[in-house]
Regions:
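Short N-terminal segments
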Residues: 2, 18-29, 33, 154-156
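Enriched - but not universal
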Residues: 1, 13, 78, 134, ...
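Short, surface-exposed tryptophan/glycine-enriched loops
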Residues: 141-184
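Basic, Lys/Arg-rich alpha-helical nucleic-acid-recognition elements, primarily the DNA-binding modules
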Residues: 1-18
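Generic hydrophobic, helix-prone segments enriched in Leu/Val/Ile
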Residues: 15, 95-98, 159
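Residue-identity detector for glutamine
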Residues: 1, 12, 25, 56-59, ...
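Mid-protein regulatory/catalytic core that forms ligand/cofactor-binding pockets
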Residues: 23-146
């Protein structure tokens, strides 16, 4: 099995932070998949915008290409992408819940619908948990894929929701770990 960290195949990250109490407020931010602040990736790897690949495929050096900011899909075999998320929460507030929504899958050469890959999620250096992605999907064309996207490449991922609450960390409402908002 491969070990990857936090991302593979997202158009954007949708982050919601909810405060508790009578003044409940929700702060949201949409972060493009190409807006990572640090990375370490190994081939097979690459990025693409809605109109073309960013640089050359399987060349990690293109992850610093200026066009990476417009990426709509990112993939790599092993490694990580790190994001700096905006924090609009007022000082001395208590975060009740943090939710991150994304599309994700494994990364296999070309694609392989059965390709288990461990993906570890972390926040502020704290490991939230590991989930095993079942595959890298190419059995049908992706709903939003551009016409130029090759049919022999990954076509879509799974829509996932990572939620951190006072009770722990959950992926699609299934407990991933005991790491809570209070520990972050």
């Amino acid at each position: 099995q491969k070990r990857c960290y936090f991302i593979k195949d997202w158009d954007q990250l949708l982050v919601n932070m909810a405060l508790s109490g009578p003044d409940l407020q929700i702060y949201s931010a949409e972060i493009g998949v190409g807006h990572f602040s640090d990375f370490s990736v190994t081939p097979t790897c690459g990025m693409a915008t809605s109109t073309s690949f960013v640089g050359q495929l399987d060349q990690p050096r293109y992850f610093i290409h200026p066009g990476s900011r417009q990426a709509r899909i990112v993939w790599f075999t092993t490694g990580y992408l790190e994001y700096i998320l905006p924090n609009f929460i007022p000082d001395h507030s208590v975060i009740e819940e943090l939710t991150v929504s994304f599309e994700i899958s494994s990364e296999a050469p070309r694609f392989c619908d059965v390709w288990p890959s461990d993906i570890t999620f972390s926040l502020n250096g704290v490991i939230l948990g590991t989930w095993t992605s079942p595959g890298d999907y190419g059995d049908r064309r992706g709903k939003y894929n551009p016409s130029w996207w090759f049919s022999f490449l990954n076509q879509y991922g799974l829509l996932k929701k990572l939620t951190i609450t006072p009770e722990g960390t959950f992926l699609d409402a299934k407990k991933l770990s005991d790491v809570s908002t209070g520990q972050l």
